[in-house]
């Protein structure tokens, strides 16, 4: 673990809450500034696409398999973030997983609260599944995007559709009731006020729905029958227990699940491309996804 790189990652996270009286537009601009620090390699292939009505970007490294797709759901507290800002993560996932990344530019709250973001992710997943030659489709999300990804899995299962071959969630926000003890116990370690993320931005996303809504707040839903899932979380984040509680609930539902904990690492640490542990995490994710393709390559 690089202490310097970890400090830099925490500084970038802290910058998101550095502006007093920030508006939603301010937060969105700040998040794009953070994502702009992740340099996209020159050989990245990026192409916009209409994925069954959902805006998205195809992001690929050269020479990757065309038969495998990872639908990527960016983070941003339900209210910010973009596919453009997550091109670099999409590229790393493409390279490590030997796949094409379909990064979804889902609609954001408060303009488009639940279920709009989930609907967009489901639409993009269906689009990926419908493509000729595609045999494997995965779902990957971080933070609020991890929660949206879990909601999409529940939605697809309830609709009786073919599920993703596996899922990966990074520091997922899955309990909008804010019942994870780490929101308080680990607050001093986290540069982000995670409780504000849950209560404030989560409230905009719910738009009056119950904080224990079984789809919008997946920790309070039925997780039986979901695909194999890899969960990554850092020790230094308020949402730590959202991940550990999710893993426990998935195990109780007889879902294949693996947990990776980054010691001393902050919220959504795998997105910070300059950090050696983030690069290692991407390699681990790629290994996990490759182990769940229909015909291992």
UniProtKB/Swiss-Prot annotation:
The EC number(s) attached to this protein equal 3.1.1.83
Checking InterPro entries in the record gives: AB_hydrolase_3, AB_hydrolase_fold, GDXG_lipolytic_enzyme
ATP-binding in keyword set: no
The family database entries (SUPFAM superfamilies) matched by this protein are listed as: alpha/beta-Hydrolases (SSF53474)
The residues responsible for catalysis, as annotated, are: 143, 237, 267
Which Pfam families does the entry link to? Abhydrolase_3
Q: How is its activity regulated?
A: Strongly inhibited by the imidazole-modifying compound 2-bromo-4'-nitroacetophenone, by HgCl(2) and CoCl(2). Not inhibited by the thiol reagents iodoacetate and dithiothreitol.
Q: Which major enzyme category is it? A: hydrolase
pH influence on activity: Optimum pH is 9.5.
Q: Which reaction does it catalyse?
A: 4-isopropenyl-7-methyloxepan-2-one + H2O = 6-hydroxy-3-isopropenylheptanoate + H(+); 7-isopropyl-4-methyloxepan-2-one + H2O = 6-hydroxy-3,7-dimethyloctanoate + H(+)
Job of this protein: Lactone hydrolase that is required for the degradation of monocyclic monoterpenes such as menthol and carvone. Catalyzes the ring opening of lactones formed during degradation of monocyclic monoterpenes. Can hydrolyze epsilon-caprolactone, the lactone derivatives of dihydrocarvone (4R)-4-isopropenyl-7-methyl-2-oxo-oxepanone and (6R)-6-isopropenyl-3-methyl-2-oxo-oxepanone, and ethyl caproate.
The subunit field of the Swiss-Prot or TrEMBL record says: Monomer.
Q: Can you tell me which family this protein belongs to?
A: Belongs to the 'GDXG' lipolytic enzyme family.
What is this protein's name? Monoterpene epsilon-lactone hydrolase
């Amino acid at each position: 673990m690089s202490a310097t790189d970890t400090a830099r990652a925490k500084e970038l996270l802290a910058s998101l809450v550095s502006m007093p009286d920030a508006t939603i537009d301010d937060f969105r601009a700040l998040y794009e500034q953070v994502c702009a620090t992740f340099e996209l390699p020159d050989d990245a292939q990026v192409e916009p696409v209409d994925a069954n009505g959902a805006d998205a970007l195809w992001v690929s490294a050269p020479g990757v398999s065309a038969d495998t797709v990872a639908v990527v759901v960016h983070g941003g507290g339900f209210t910010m973030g973009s596919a453009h800002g997550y091109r670099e993560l999409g590229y790393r996932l493409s390279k490590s997983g030997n796949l094409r990344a379909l990064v979804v530019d889902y609609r954001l709250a408060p303009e488009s609260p639940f279920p709009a973001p989930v609907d967009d992710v489901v639409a993009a997943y269906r689009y990926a599944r419908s493509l000729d030659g595609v045999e494997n489709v995965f779902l990957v999300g971080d933070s609020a995007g991890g929660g949206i990804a879990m909601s999409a899995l529940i939605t697809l299962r309830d609709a009786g559709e073919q599920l993703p071959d596996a899922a990966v969630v990074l520091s997922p926000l899955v309990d909008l009731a804010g019942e994870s003890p780490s929101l308080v116990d680990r607050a001093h370690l986290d540069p982000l006020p995670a409780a504000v993320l849950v209560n404030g931005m989560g409230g905009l996303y719910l738009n009056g729905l119950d904080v224990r809504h079984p789809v919008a707040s997946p920790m309070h839903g039925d997780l039986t029958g979901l695909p194999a899932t890899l969960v990554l979380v850092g020790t230094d984040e308020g949402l730590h227990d959202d991940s550990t509680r999710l893993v426990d609930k998935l195990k109780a539902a007889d879902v294949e699940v693996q947990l990776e904990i980054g010691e001393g690492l902050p919220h959504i640490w795998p997105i910070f491309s300059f950090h050696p542990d983030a690069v290692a995490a991407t390699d681990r994710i790629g290994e996990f996804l490759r182990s769940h393709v229909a015909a291992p390559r």
